[in-house]
Amino acid sequence: MLFIHVFFQILLFLVSCTIVFSLFHFLVTGNTPSVSTPDWVIGKMAENREIKDGDIFYDLGCGTGRLIFNLSEVFTGTNFIGIENSLPQYLFARVRSFFLKRRNVSIKFENFLKTDLSDADHIYVWIYLRDIKLLKEKFEKELKSGCYIYSLDFPMPDVPVYKTIELKKTSKFGHTLFIYRY
């Protein structure tokens, strides 16, 4: 019983530190704050039939890795790579990786603007328009033909949309998933 109590205290401490450090990271760097993709949106992503065995799926700014860990259960033959540059979020994702032991998931601590994406078949982002503009240039230089880009809520300027999915929840708020194909 003591072990469980200590475990949950440590877990609560890690979650609290993640929130505080994420807020600090946002205030100091001005980078996109860490907000997890809602579970119901992840569920809609899991219905995606374009993801195949052997594909490589990047989550740029993966946070705690919730999206890729959930999708890795559905798409067991796909390799998922999370890229995160916030140390607390990265460490949380690594701890999650240790406990979940998913062989098709890896987490990297690096700036996604410096990540080589030339092997990507799928890329997911939920970031501000300012950062999407930077990524657009990177995508045009690096991505192979046929790569899918999934951008939640923020469209890429001057790039034709392959598909738009209005993700509705029962509440008054929903999301839009913009899908691009390079």
Residue ranges and their predicted role:
Residues D131-Y182:
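C-terminal substrate-binding/active-site "lid" region of AdoMet-derived donor-dependent transferases
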Residues A120-L134:
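A short SAM/SAH-binding and catalytic strip from SAM-dependent methyltransferases
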